[in-house]
């Protein structure tokens, strides 16, 4: 066995399942950084995580830091001694800091002078001496939002700690971590294997824990086993398990010895919308639903036990008994809610505040209704259906089902609207009004749904900015960043002809006198353009490309996107660098001039061949490109403008812009301003690097 394998395991009470992976990864990253900063050579750092433990295993860890030579330069000789050759206070202070006397110092001579010099051979500290503080420091830096204190001690950690194992090879490293003395004792599964045992060597981990403790400490191995076993269990009943990544991660963090089992529920519950059943199975019980090959929910579910029982049927029956009342509740709520129309919930919206200064949910509903109709008119959607969907948009929030199962908002509105005989695009809009809910989420599928989704988000943006409660730092209680990005994605990806200026003005107008921020329209637009910056950076666009387009402040998102793609393509052209530099030069020249320019370039004042050539090219391109600009064909326009490289280069090589003759000078400045105006029709390419 290798004598330089290092193991640390922190044995705790059950750790927060949703934080387990991040805790383990952060622990590994922190320890790796500590080792690197200390100059300790090491091999692979592996992390392990289970509900009651965090562990790291470091391969090939050096026994000590490498020895090193230390040099510390002192004062120059001229300042180190007085006229009588006695050491100055500066020299004596420096020597004390080095642990020597001045006469023990060496001298360093260079072409710039002579200095006192201290040289020392520093022996590296042993790894054994360094590790305790490294581990303590790494644990203290873990991302723990809320610490616990237990017993009578002042020790704080995410959960109470029971064991600390620190092994370097076969040797226990003496230390007290989180109030617990280090040892070689490890605790196994609560109900299987050995409850407690000793580990002789770091290399035995995690195999010894698997064999004697019945714990799979390897997180990824445990996760892969759950996934494979669940897929196989679903296949056996002719279905496919819904193994969403977030739930799979959570279940992996809840069990030490996963045993996958299959259970069932009564088929009568399938009459309830599947979303409600799935919500309670996944959200409350941490079960995996099962669907047939057509995507229809089956009356089965898969769950993961944390014990290998001699009578698994008893565990299965227990879980079936647990889930049945929840499904029965969903069935009851569904049947009760359908006894009245969705629209009948409108008066109850008056009892729920949207925001104290902005009114109730009924007030918000009225604004969404009006704004959705206005948007529908702009994008060619059915105005009547959009206003109807806007009116019903929040009614399902007052139903029993959504009150009990909050994540079913929207989707239950869709089911109840269908039951009431509403138009299909109205029903779908009630579900899709919240889309996209997160990055990469699906967008609303029809124009009516797009209108309602945009209206809902714009109403929130206008209202919250209108009372001066915009996001600050990482605090965004009204999810305004998500709302803004959602609006932009819908408009761009659905290619809707909407202008943020008029859209925001309409959203603000519907608030009447409630808003107090006089600059609300500009604030909302600036905020949304800022979301564009983050979006396109995530898409891989260069910051300077984004800046070039933002400089024009285009307020039509689809138009903004077209400009981004055009500038990105322009950068691939051979002429782009020269023209970007030329535009920067033109911008600087014009900025330094305070003279009033002409409205047009006067051909009669042009003298040099190069300026005549450039002016001629600009006239031709101006006429040719106007239809391109009007149609948003920015990429084609920039390809045409790339042909200006040669005449622009010739102009700067052969023409003196700041001529002594005022008329000639102003005419040349006007010519350059017309050149810049053409490029600015697309973007400010002078900002390209």
UniProtKB/Swiss-Prot annotation:
Belongs to the class-II aminoacyl-tRNA synthetase family. Signal peptide: none annotated. It is found in: Cytoplasm. It catalyses: tRNA(Gly) + glycine + ATP = glycyl-tRNA(Gly) + AMP + diphosphate. InterPro entries: DALR_anticod-bd, Gly-tRNA-synth_bsu, Gly-tRNA-synth_heterodimer. The keyword Repressor does not apply. This is Glycine--tRNA ligase beta subunit.
């Amino acid at each position: 066995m290798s004598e330089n394998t290092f193991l640390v395991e922190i044995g705790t009470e059950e750790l927060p399942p949703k934080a387990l992976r991040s805790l383990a990864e952060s622990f590994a990253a922190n320890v790796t950084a500590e080792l690197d900063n200390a100059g300790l050579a090491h091999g692979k750092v592996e992390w392990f995580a289970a509900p009651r433990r965090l562990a790291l295993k470091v391969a090939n860890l050096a026994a000590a830091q490498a020895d090193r030579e230390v040099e510390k330069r002192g004062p120059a000789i001229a300042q180190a001694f007085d006229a009588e050759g006695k050491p100055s206070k500066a020299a004596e202070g420096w020597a004390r800091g080095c642990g020597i006397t001045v006469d023990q110092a060496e001298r360093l001579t260079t072409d710039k002078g002579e200095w006192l010099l201290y040289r020392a051979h520093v022996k590296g500290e042993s790894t054994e001496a360094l590790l305790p503080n490294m581990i303590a420091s790494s644990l203290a830096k873990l991302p723990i939002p809320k610490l616990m204190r237990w017993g009578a001690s002042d020790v704080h950690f995410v959960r109470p700690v029971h064991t600390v194992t620190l092994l370097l090879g076969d040797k226990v490293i003496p230390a007290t971590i989180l109030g617990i003395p280090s040892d070689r004792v490890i605790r196994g599964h609560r109900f299987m294997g050995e409850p407690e045992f000793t580990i002789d060597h770091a290399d035995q981990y995690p195999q010894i824990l698997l064999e004697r403790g019945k714990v799979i400490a390897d997180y990824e191995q445990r996760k892969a086993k759950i996934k494979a076993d669940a897929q196989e269990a679903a296949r056996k009943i002719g279905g496919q398990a819904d193994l969403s990544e977030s739930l799979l991660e959570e279940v992996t963090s809840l069990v030490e010895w996963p045993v996958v089992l299959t259970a069932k529920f009564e088929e009568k519950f399938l009459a309830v919308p599947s979303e409600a059943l799935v919500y309670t199975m996944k959200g409350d019980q941490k079960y995996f639903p099962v669907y047939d090959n057509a995507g229809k929910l089956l009356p089965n579910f898969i769950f993961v036990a944390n014990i290998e029982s001699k009578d698994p049927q008893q565990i299965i029956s227990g879980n079936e008994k647990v889930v049945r009342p929840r499904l029965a509740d969903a069935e009851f709520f569904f049947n009760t809610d359908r006894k009245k129309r969705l629209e009948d919930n409108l008066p109850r919206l008056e009892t729920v505040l949207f925001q104290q200064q902005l009114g109730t949910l009924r007030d918000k509903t009225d604004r969404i209704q009006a704004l959705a109709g206005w948007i529908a008119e702009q994008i060619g959607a059915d105005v009547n259906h959009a206003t109807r969907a806007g009116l019903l948009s929040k009614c399902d929030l007052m139903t029993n089902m959504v009150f009990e199962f909050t994540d079913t908002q929207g989707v239950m509105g869709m089911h109840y609207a269908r039951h009431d005989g509403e138009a299909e695009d109205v029903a779908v809009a009630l579900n899709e009004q919240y889309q996209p809910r997160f990055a990469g989420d699906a967008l609303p599928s029809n124009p009516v749904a797009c209108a309602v989704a945009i209206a809902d988000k714009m109403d929130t943006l206008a209202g919250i900015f209108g009372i001066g409660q915009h996001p600050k730092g990482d605090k965004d209680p009204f999810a305004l960043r998500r709302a803004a990005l959602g609006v932009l994605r819908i408009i761009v990806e659905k290619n809707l002809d909407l202008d943020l200026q008029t859209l925001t003005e309409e959203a603000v107008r519907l608030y009447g006198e409630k808003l107090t921020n006089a600059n609300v329209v500009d604030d909302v637009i600036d905020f949304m353009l800022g979301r564009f910056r983050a979006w396109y950076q995530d898409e891989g666009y260069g910051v300077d490309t984004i800046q070039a387009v933002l400089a024009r402040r285009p307020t039509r998102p689809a138009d903004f996107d077209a400009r981004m793609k055009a500038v990105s393509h322009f950068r691939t052209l051979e002429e782009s660098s020269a023209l970007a530099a030329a535009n920067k030069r033109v911008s600087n020249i014009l900025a330094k001039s305070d003279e009033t320019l002409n409205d047009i370039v006067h051909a009669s004042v042009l003298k040099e061949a190069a300026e005549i050539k450039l002016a001629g090219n600009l006239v031709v391109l101006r006429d040719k490109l106007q239809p391109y600009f009007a149609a948003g064909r920015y990429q084609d326009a920039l390809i045409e403008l790339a042909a200006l490289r040669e005449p622009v280069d010739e102009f700067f090589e052969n023409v003196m812009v700041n001529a002594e003759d005022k008329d000639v000078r102003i005419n040349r400045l006007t010519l350059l301003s017309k050149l810049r105006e053409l490029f600015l029709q697309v973007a400010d390419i002078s900002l390209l690097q």
